[in-house]
């Protein structure tokens, strides 16, 4: 039987990444602590449980839970395209053993770099962006990000967007691991909404 709490945590992670991408594309900036929460998920390769991926605190997924509840009610077409696009990309990654191996190899070296740089330093964001470009983008079904050209043309913003997309893939991988399927959006949407509301109200 599906564990809807774990599935909802992971989906909230995907939606939180998608929301950060949207905010960066439109405004060029995001809440730095929410960004740090997302980036930190990439370092959680052997978590004790699902919530541990997000620092063990439900409040770290507040934005994602809000976004998930809005999306399950179909409120934002662009955002809908982002988070469903992340799930589609993860599906392609899941079927590509070489890409999965390369992604794991690149992620493995992140702690070494963190000995020299903070997670939010430009060098780290550039490294994470390059992982997305090198490993995820070639899988196809590329996500077309819409926003202000003023921000989208800036390398710093591009790196942040790609780093956030990578964190979205991380949560999408987790979503699959804990039993998430696209059928649930058709047949268990009410259950997902109710679970998200329950978690949100406990924050």
Curated annotation (Swiss-Prot):
Principal location: cytoplasm
SUPFAM superfamilies the UniProt entry points to: YcfC-like
Domain of life of the source: Bacteria
Protein's gene: hflD
Lineage: Bacteria, Pseudomonadati, Pseudomonadota, Gammaproteobacteria, Pasteurellales
Presence of the UniProt keyword Plastid in the record: no
PANTHER family for this protein: HIGH FREQUENCY LYSOGENIZATION PROTEIN HFLD
Organism: Histophilus somni (strain 2336)
Compartments, record wording: Cytoplasm; Cell inner membrane
Swiss-Prot/TrEMBL keywords: Cell inner membrane, Cell membrane, Cytoplasm, Membrane
Protein name: High frequency lysogenization protein HflD homolog
Listed GO CC annotations: cytoplasm; plasma membrane
Pfam families in the cross-refs: DUF489
Family: Belongs to the HflD family.
């Amino acid at each position: 039987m599906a564990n809807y709490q774990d599935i909802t945590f992971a989906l909230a992670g995907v939606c939180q990444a998608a929301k950060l991408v949207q905010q960066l594309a439109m405004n060029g900036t995001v809440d730095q602590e929410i960004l740090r929460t997302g980036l930190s998920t990439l370092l959680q390769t052997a978590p004790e449980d699902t919530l541990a991926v997000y620092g063990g605190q439900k409040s770290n997924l507040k934005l994602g839970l809000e976004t998930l509840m809005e999306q399950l009610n179909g409120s934002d077409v662009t955002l809908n395209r982002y988070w469903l696009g992340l799930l589609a990309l993860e599906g392609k990654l899941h079927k590509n053993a070489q890409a999965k191996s390369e992604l794991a190899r690149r992620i493995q070296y992140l702690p070494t770099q963190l000995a020299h740089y903070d997670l939010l330093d430009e060098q780290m964001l550039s490294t994470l962006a390059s992982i997305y470009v090198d490993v995820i983008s070639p899988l196809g079904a590329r996500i077309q990000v819409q926003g202000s050209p003023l921000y989208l043309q800036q390398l710093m913003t591009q790196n942040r967007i790609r780093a956030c997309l990578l964190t979205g893939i991380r949560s999408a991988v987790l979503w699959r691991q804990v039993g998430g399927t696209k059928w649930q959006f058709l047949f268990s949407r009410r259950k997902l909404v109710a679970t998200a509301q329950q978690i949100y109200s406990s924050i």
